[in-house]
Amino acid sequence: MGQKGHKDSLYPCGGTPESSLHEALDQCMTALDLFLTNQFSEALSYLKPRTKESMYHSLTYATILEMQAMMTFDPQDILLAGNMMKEAQMLCQRHRRKSSVTDSFSSLVNRPTLGQFTEEEIHAEVCYAECLLQRAALTFLQGSSHGGAVRPRALHDPSHACSCPPGPGRQHLFLLQDENMVSFIKGGIKVRNSYQTYKELDSLVQSSQYCKGENHPHFEGGVKLGVGAFNLTLSMLPTRILRLLEFVGFSGNKDYGLLQLEEGASGHSFRSVLCVMLLLCYHTFLTFVLGTGNVNIEEAEKLLKPYLNRYPKGAIFLFFAGRIEVIKGNIDAAIRRFEECCEAQQHWKQFHHMCYWELMWCFTYKGQWKMSYFYADLLSKENCWSKATYIYMKAAYLSMFGKEDHKPFGDDEVELFRAVPGLKLKIAGKSLPTEKFAIRKSRRYFSSNPISLPVPALEMMYIWNGYAVIGKQPKLTDGILEIITKAEEMLEKGPENEYSVDDECLVKLLKGLCLKYLGRVQEAEENFRSISANEKKIKYDHYLIPNALLELALLLMEQDRNEEAIKLLESAKQNYKNYSMESRTHFRIQAATLQAKSSLENSSRSMVSSVSL
């Protein structure tokens, strides 16, 4: 690594490392611009000639392939992206200083300074950390279970849709179970090494000895991206997981993570748009699905606006524009955005699939079951992420139809529900929580005379926090409440069976949510409390109890009854284990607890200020 002759051989036409680094960054910015204007193959073709010599070309090329793999979950895409990212990492290693930033991590005396690194070497460090992190993500994906052999195909085929054949072959693991555990451990090691590198680089940037080189905005942008991503992600984890990670050296600060990403997003670097996309994911997905539904939508719109102006037909930004409209409760506007996103490009079908998923939920919010079914059906035929979930949703929507509506589709919901368990896949040896939930709910259909689920589509809507969407529009909430009330009346009139209490409690949970958003607070509280009162009678849907406590706590928080809310949240966290969607519930409990404690602290400060005055 330290031999000058070897380094110079990496640069054609006698270029210096510094000039070649600047040129590489300019070219990668051009490729990124092509990508953001939906010219996906052109971006890859532009980058490919220098992927064997330039670490930035190699990393950017591999990143685009990884984005494709993340969207398709296809083993071919995962394998291809993994191999390319490994090559990028090896290339970064060739450019790194022999004594890297983490080599002396354990020594407080001999810790490195930036003066010991050339500009190229310090860029190699941040690119190396990025490769490690992205390879870790792919390692976790390599436990995906898909049918069919992995067939070689061209590197430049982003139009590839799901090639997984129908039938039980999808049950076979892409890797064996024990290999999945090895993959998981390897992925964890990569994450830790990446974390330590970013941590050291952040310390170097903050040091007084930091001297900025010609391409320092790109280097700093890379550090801010990594440090911000780690801090933000770690800060969201449930307390019990975070304590374990802190024991092995990890720590996360949400405010610092957001600050780093916001600074990275506001700069003019190669990674600025990556910081923007990560922040948009955080604001429009993570805090919404894994949080309380309180989203900083103004910040999301502020981040998106300049990119939507610059790339008005950019599929990525149109998609986020649709997500923002969903969260605001503007469902018709969201539908137009997602349809526009699909029309904007035809090359990467994976973007279409993301839009189909969102459109499925948009029509669910409107109670238009035929359109919801249509998009679930499209996903089940074209996308490999979770066949079990898609088929379950098809069955769920069919069960919401009137009997006269079934025939045109030629599907039978009972047969579809029965097919769900055979479509399960695994990632890193673990089943997807949504699939496990769908499989558990489908089990009742295996009896000779199955008892139907009362409102399966509206139950899954709760799992994805959809009531926080319809709650923005009283008309939508009224429509869903009417459906739930009819289901409640049918349960009351019907004969008692082994699922009666479970179904009644489910309906009360969903009814309570609608009543809450309609401002009928007392009625909502009564519905939530009735679930806890029937705790001992619930046989199967044990997830209802901690979630009822969570929803009751959120209701109390809106009334500034934060101390009561915290007690309920603590009970939900400590007293219930091994239920469906437990991790997602714990994420939401963590977010609610932090919000309640923050409100209490603000109230205390206000009281102290008023007393001092």
Swiss-Prot record:
Q: What are the UniProt keywords, alphabetically?
A: Repeat, TPR repeat
Pfam families named among the record's database cross-references:
Iml2-TPR_39
Q: Which domain of life is it from?
A: Eukaryota
According to the UniProt record, one GO cellular component term is: centrosome
Q: Where do the TPR repeats start and stop?
A: 315-348, 505-538, 546-579
Q: Which family does it belong to?
A: Belongs to the TTC39 family.
Q: What is this protein called?
A: Tetratricopeptide repeat protein 39A
Q: What organism is this sequence from?
A: Homo sapiens
Upper taxonomic classification of the species?
Eukaryota, Metazoa, Chordata, Craniata, Vertebrata
